[in-house]
Curated annotation (Swiss-Prot):
Domain ATP-grasp: 9-248
InterPro entries linked to this entry: ATP-grasp, ATP-grasp_succ-CoA_synth-type, ATP_grasp_subdomain_1, Succ-CoA_synthase_bsu_CS, SUCC_ACL_C, Succ_CoA_ligase-like_bsu, Succinyl-CoA_synth-like
Binding sites annotated in the UniProt record for substrate: 268, 325-327
Source organism (scientific name): Leptospira interrogans serogroup Icterohaemorrhagiae serovar Lai (strain 56601)
GO CC terms of this entry: cytosol; succinate-CoA ligase complex
Catalytic reaction list: succinate + ATP + CoA = succinyl-CoA + ADP + phosphate; GTP + succinate + CoA = succinyl-CoA + GDP + phosphate
Protein's recorded name: Succinate--CoA ligase [ADP-forming] subunit beta
Chain's gene name: sucC
Pathway(s) of this molecule: Carbohydrate metabolism; tricarboxylic acid cycle; succinate from succinyl-CoA (ligase route): step 1/1
Length: 390
């Protein structure tokens, strides 16, 4: 689950990490009060106004402004709050800014990159760091891979002091900042483990002119499967930042991810769903979604799946690919017919049924009188739907 920067920093504060003081607001009339609270608390005059959306690259899109006066801060809030912010991660449609974070300005000497995540190839948590702070880490990996440092953490013993010290030396941090760096690294590692995060990223990690190490920006992704252990973190969910179709799908207990193509895919099983998307692309078309209706697919599930798929105006055709194991293909076929009638289906529909009662399922579809194209071969089915949408 993605959360906002101000929420991520709230988590870091729980674990005594050094983060700037800030105030979040969702109304422009609260800008003056928020500015005063930040400056009176910190004693400084510089306030950074940051758009709060679930996407990176906010600064490049005009969503981050450094202000030196109260008037400038109010003007920045007025401009950013409510804007449609477009960044490299939002897509061309952008995201509407519904909250802004007014934060204490920091006297920056140098910026670094720091993150904690799971490396599945070695089955361990790793710490990644770089001297190239403030940049997209993917860009650094492509242009200067030698500037990315990695340390693997033994899950049995956790982060060790010597590892933190080693990383400080390899980053070239001044000796006066090592204690501050080790303290922050220990705090964010504790946060990553205890809060069940799947990613914790600080970019930039700031070295101040006073040799303090501070988390300038923070991104945390939380493991949704562990939220039952963290009621306070579950409350951080902001559905206004999520795709409405994905929210609706979660209410139906469907695994749905919206994509940019025009062929809606309905499949049972995540592996088959991935293979279906691949075969659609090989046929020269683009999948509009990932949709796994699960092993217990029934009439209601299929109808809800159709509603989700057709909620995307880009969908020009639907490819249903079902392998009957636990689920019976004839029951799925009945669900497809019922769903097609319920949603008044007007786009081409190709159905591939294999497995338990697949022949009976095909017979049910053939007798329905609906314009449904049944195909047995996977590659042929993908080619058929690609041709039908032109």
């Amino acid at each position: 689950m993605k959360i906002h920067e101000y929420q991520a920093k709230e988590i870091l504060r729980r674990h005594k990490a050094n983060v700037p003081f800030g105030v979040v607001i969702d109304k422009k009339e609260n800008a003056s009060k928020a500015h005063d609270e930040v400056t009176s608390k910190t004693g400084g005059s510089v306030v950074v106004v940051k758009a709060q959306i679930h996407a990176g690259g906010r600064g490049k899109g005009g969503g981050v402004k450094v202000t030196k006066t109260k008037e400038d801060a109010i003007a920045a809030v007025d401009k950013i709050l409510g804007m449609q912010l477009i960044t490299p991660q939002t897509g061309p449609e952008g995201k509407k800014v519904l909250k802004v974070y007014l934060e204490q300005g920091i006297d920056i000497a140098k910026e670094y990159y720091l993150s904690i995540l799971l490396d599945r190839s070695i089955r361990k948590t790793i710490i990644m760091a770089s001297t190239e702070g403030g940049m997209e880490i993917e860009e650094v990996a492509e242009t200067h891979p030698e500037k990315i440092l990695k340390i693997a953490i033994d899950p049995g013993i956790g982060l060790q002091v010597n590892q933190a010290r080693q990383l400080a030396f390899e980053l070239g941090l001044p000796a006066e900042s090592h204690k501050s760096f080790q303290s922050l690294l220990a705090a964010i590692y504790e946060a990553y483990i205890k809060e069940d995060a799947s990613l914790l990223e600080i970019n930039p990690l700031i070295l101040t002119k006073q040799n303090e190490i501070i988390a300038g920006d923070c991104k945390i992704d939380l493991d949704e499967n562990a939220l039952y252990r963290h009621a306070d973190n579950a409350a951080f969910r902001d559905i206004t930042e999520e795709d409405p179709l994905e929210v609706q799908a979660s209410e139906f207990n469907l695994n749905y991810v919206k994509l940019d193509g025009n062929i809606g895919c309905m499949v049972n099983g995540a592996g088959l769903a991935m293979a279906t998307m691949d075969i659609v692309k090989l046929a020269g078309a683009e999948p509009a979604n990932f949709l796994d209706v699960g092993g217990g697919a029934n009439k209601t599930t299929v109808t809800n799946g159709f509603k989700i798929i057709l909620g995307d105006p880009n969908v020009k055709g639907i490819f249903v690919n079902i392998f009957g194991g636990i689920v019976r293909c004839d029951m799925v076929a009945e669900g497809i017919i019922e769903a097609a009638k319920a949603v008044d289906l007007k786009v081409p529909l190709v159905v591939r049924l294999q497995g338990t009662n697949s022949e009976l399922g095909r017979e049910v579809l053939n007798k329905s009188g609906l314009k449904i194209t049944g195909v047995d071969d996977l590659r042929e089915a993908a080619s058929t739907i690609a041709k039908l949408i032109g």
